[in-house]
UniProtKB/Swiss-Prot annotation:
It comes from Treponema denticola (strain ATCC 35405 / DSM 14222 / CIP 103919 / JCM 8153 / KCTC 15104). The gene is dinB. Poorly processive, error-prone DNA polymerase involved in untargeted mutagenesis. Copies undamaged DNA at stalled replication forks, which arise in vivo from mismatched or misaligned primer ends. These misaligned primers can be extended by PolIV. Exhibits no 3'-5' exonuclease (proofreading) activity. May be involved in translesional synthesis, in conjunction with the beta clamp from PolIII. This is DNA polymerase IV. PROSITE patterns: UMUC (PS50173). GO terms for molecular function: damaged DNA binding; DNA-directed DNA polymerase activity; magnesium ion binding.
Length: 395
């Protein structure tokens, strides 16, 4: 008899804002809004106190100030957030060797077979939550199910500091209980098309044929939704590469389309990946970009070249790949960036064999920035583009 699969999706609650409240106790219980502070800035993350005023991520800062004039508005400290993220991710390793980090504040844990060590999924999830709270001061919400897609949705059903378990055989009932807006992957435009066709609830969609859904949404989106409402999506979050890789991605509450916004997000993803590259003392030559449109069509593109040298190098390569693949007409729901075929970095004495003198200097400067930041735990140095984005863009 096959072992029943168990997956956790763990999401750090209001991560950036929670770190700010943790580091500044006077902010506890108050509306904290992290994001760019200029007229063009947008909200990255806000505390649950701020959400009561209607503030949400990707909202223009000016609008957030109008909704929540008493809010505490802060620029992001990405290096500090990475530090706290690493603390949480290291705790995961004490619970399972199979971890897939999908962003700075969320990850999937394959807990299959771990009941022999930690007991039932409920017991292990409660222990995980307790350990994270005690060791980092942060709270997490956990979704538990037989596949990653259901676990992802479940983690959002009892936020903050929640635990929601969907037992085997309960997937369809769980999906039918959801408001249409809570079906992961179904954005505003998709909902509009479904409602226009008379499909306003998950049970109605469940009772529709795959052919009908494809006629409304297109083949890819129709098939996706047909499987989603049945809880049968087993590969949405499967590993895209078999070899060792380091990746990050971001799903947006509101779809992206402008090139300026896309470039800003791409640079942040590149910065996050290089931070992890330096931290793990590895290198890679293959860059991959993933695009998920708001109709849930997903495309990816990759290329192999010289060893990725620094954040700017990674950003330029990723940006070139992105615009080769982007259809320039469909809003984007998710962006992902990956460095593949990772291997241990070469000894410093051999570096000059693989990098030009200019690139060696650039890489060493960025490694020094990372080392100082890690040592001091604050933004001592950072790339000029990130300084600009502290003022203007998405954190």
């Amino acid at each position: 008899m096959a072992t029943e699969k168990v997956f956790f999706h763990v999401d750090i609650d209001a991560f950036f804002a929670s770190v700010e409240q943790l580091d500044n106790p006077e902010y506890m219980g108050k509306p904290v809004i992290v994001g760019g502070q200029s007229e063009r800035g947008v909200v990255s993350t806000c505390s649950y106190e701020a959400r009561k005023f209607g503030v949400h991520s990707a909202m223009p800062i000016l609008q957030a100030r109008k909704l929540c004039p008493s809010g505490i508005f802060l620029r992001g400290r990405m290096d500090r957030y990475h530090e706290k993220s690493k603390e949480v991710m290291s705790i995961f390793k004490d619970f399972t060797p199979e971890i897939k980090q999908i962003s700075v504040d969320e990850a999937f844990l394959n807990m299959t077979g771990m009941e022999k060590i930690f007991g039932t999924p409920k017991n292990s999830a409660l222990l995980l939550k307790k350990t994270i709270k005690e060791e980092t001061g942060l709270t997490v919400s956990v979704g538990c199910a037989q596949n990653k897609y259901i676990a992802k949705i479940a983690s959002g059903r009892s936020k903050p500091d929640g635990l929601f378990i969907v037992k085997a055989g309960e997937e369809i009932d769980f999906m039918k209980s959801l408001p249409l807006k809570d079906v992961w992957g179904v954005g505003g435009k998709t909902r509009e098309r479904l409602i226009a066709a008379g499909l306003t609830s998950v049970p109605q969609i469940f009772n529709s044929s795959e052919h009908l859904l494809q006629s409304i949404l297109g083949n890819a989106s129709g098939s996706f939704l047909f499987q989603a409402v049945r809880g049968e999506l087993y590969d949405v979050f499967s590993d895209d590469v078999k070899s060792h890789s380091i990746s990050t991605e971001r799903t947006f509450e509101h779809d992206l389309f402008s090139h300026a916004e896309i470039d800003d997000v791409m640079f942040y993803l590149a910065s996050e990946l290089m931070y992890r590259i330096f931290d793990e003392k590895v290198k890679g030559k293959t860059v991959s970009v993933k695009i998920r449109y708001n109709d849930f069509t997903t495309v990816s593109v990759q290329s192999t070249g010289a060893v990725v040298n620094d954040t700017q190098d990674l950003f330029e390569r990723a940006r070139e790949l992105f615009y080769k693949k982007f259809d320039n007409k469909t809003p984007i729901r998710l962006l992902g960036l990956c460095i593949m075929n990772i291997e241990s970095d070469i000894p410093e004495a051999q570096t000059e064999l693989f990098y030009s003198e200019k690139n060696v200097k650039k890489r060493k400067i960025e490694e020094t920035m990372y080392t100082l930041t890690k040592k001091e735990g604050k933004n001592i140095l950072k790339p000029a583009r990130l300084l600009k984005k502290d003022k203007d863009g998405l954190e």
